[in-house]
């Protein structure tokens, strides 16, 4: 039975599977190149510079130089972005689930410009699942960022005399939490960016490939400190 099903599946979704594999390899190759450059020069990455900036900022605020109000306002502004994005991701998840329930009705119309890809409703559901998982990862990344930043909001105003004897309350450990929150925000942003080629995949594998190439080029520019954002 499996031998009868497998060739049919390959004929139906072979192009989509091969293009998806090529896109995954392209993304992995980019991150391998980026990792190699960062090992050689950490300041090549905007993320390294951002982490270093957050660590210096936390140590400055916790040094007791009267920056309590500024620290709270800065962290509040930091938290507002992931709060907004959590709501956005929730709406995207609901919208994606709505699409999955209408696969039989809209798959054919969305495949009007599909060049070489599958028109099967089953493959369409697989595409929707990839998109749904992407939005779920972004959602939990932003939720984690909010959680970590809320902890930092309390920890950063602890008096210096109360920090003695508690290594977990030291500026270094508080900075680690804020840096991790920043990494979660960056993860959420990158995940949403990768939703672009996944959305293009709904129209066909060719558009997935084009979208992935565009996103990798965009991320390569975004991650550089010299031209990063």
Model-derived features with residue positions:
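Hydrophobic alpha-helical transmembrane segments
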Residues: 11-21, 115-131, 205-210
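Short, strongly hydrophobic alpha-helical membrane anchors
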Residues: 1-14
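Juxtamembrane "helix exit" motif at the C-terminal ends of alpha-helical transmembrane segments
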Residues: 2-4, 90-116, 201-209, 215-220
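Solvent-exposed, non-transmembrane helices and loops of integral membrane proteins
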Residues: 58-69, 154-183
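Hydrophobic alpha-helical membrane-embedded segments
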Residues: 16-46, 83-97, 128-151, 193
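Transmembrane alpha-helical segments and their cytosolic interface motifs
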Residues: 71-97, 183-209
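Membrane-interface amphipathic/juxtamembrane segments adjacent to transmembrane helices
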Residues: 36-74
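Juxtamembrane membrane-interface segments at transmembrane alpha-helix termini
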Residues: 164, 220-229
């Amino acid at each position: 039975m499996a031998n009868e099903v497998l060739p049919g599946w390959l004929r139906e979704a072979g192009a989509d599977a091969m293009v998806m594999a090529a896109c995954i390899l392209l993304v992995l190759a980019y991150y391998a190149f980026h990792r190699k450059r960062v090992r050689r020069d950490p300041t090549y990455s905007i993320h390294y510079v951002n982490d270093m900036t957050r660590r210096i900022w936390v140590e400055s605020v916790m040094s007791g130089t009267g920056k309590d109000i500024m620290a709270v306002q800065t962290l509040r502004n930091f938290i507002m972005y992931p709060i907004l994005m959590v709501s956005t991701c929730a709406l995207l998840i609901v919208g994606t689930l709505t699409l999955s329930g209408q696969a039989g009705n809209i798959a054919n119309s969305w495949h009007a410009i599909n060049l070489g890809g599958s028109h099967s409703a089953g493959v369409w559901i697989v595409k929707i699942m990839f998109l749904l998982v992407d939005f779920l990862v972004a959602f939990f990344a932003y939720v984690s960022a909010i959680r970590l930043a809320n902890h930092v909001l309390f920890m950063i105003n602890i008096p210096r005399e109360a920090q003695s004897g508690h290594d977990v309350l030291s500026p270094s450990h508080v900075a680690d939490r804020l840096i991790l929150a920043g990494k979660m925000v960056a993860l959420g942003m990158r995940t949403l960016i990768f939703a672009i080629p996944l959305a293009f995949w709904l129209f066909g594998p060719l558009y997935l490939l084009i979208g992935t190439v565009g996103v990798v080029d965009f991320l390569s520019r975004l991650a550089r400190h010299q031209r990063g954002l």
